[in-house]
A protein has these predicted regions:
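An N-terminal assembly and electron-transfer interface module characteristic of large anaerobic redox
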Residues: 1-164
Length: 164
């Protein structure tokens, strides 16, 4: 990830102007089983979608489902930002969506199982409340699927400010 000091001043000022409201108390989640028994989902902010699914649009807070067995060649990056560097994704999808690494962790017994369906949002610096309804919807899907943990992968400075 690029360091804030390494990006142009106008972009750095834009990022720093996005004040985030306090999120309040964090809900306590009991960690009642080891990682080796947990079902884990990957959630990325890279703006990825299945080739036949709808592309992400500007200021899009929705998410796309990415089945675990989907071929990398069928996954597109339709992130709307013109400032978004796609070169890492073009070389190796695992840079923004570490699906192969998690399959390896599963086969090594480090995690119990990778979820059958994983997800992508398109980051881009919108405030967290813009995503809230869709995140709550996704949380219900993850819970219904028996997911115990999610690996959330913000892939740019704007995404990091939104997710964190």
């Amino acid at each position: 990830m690029v360091k804030l000091a390494d990006i142009p001043e106008y972009e750095r000022n834009h990022l720093m102007s996005k004040l985030l409201p306090p999120l309040g108390e964090l809900p306590w989640v009991a960690n009642n089983k080891p990682l080796s028994e947990k079902k884990v989902a990957i959630i990325t902010t890279a703006g990825l979608n299945f080739r036949q699914d709808s592309n992400f649009e500007f200021a899009d807070s929705s998410y796309r489902a990415l089945p675990r067995d989907l071929s990398s060649s069928d996954i597109l990056m339709t992130h709307a930002s013109v400032n978004y560097d796609r070169s890492g994704f073009q070389e190796d999808i695992n840079v923004v969506f570490p699906i192969d690494r998690f399959k390896e962790l599963e086969s090594e017994g480090v995690i119990g199982r990778l979820a059958d369906v994983n997800y992508s949002f398109m980051g881009g610096g919108m405030l967290p409340d813009v995503y809230e309804a869709n995140v709550r919807d996704l949380a219900k899907l993850l819970k219904a699927d028996g997911v115990d943990a999610a690996f959330i992968l913000p892939v740019c400075p704007n995404c990091s400010r939104t997710v964190c």
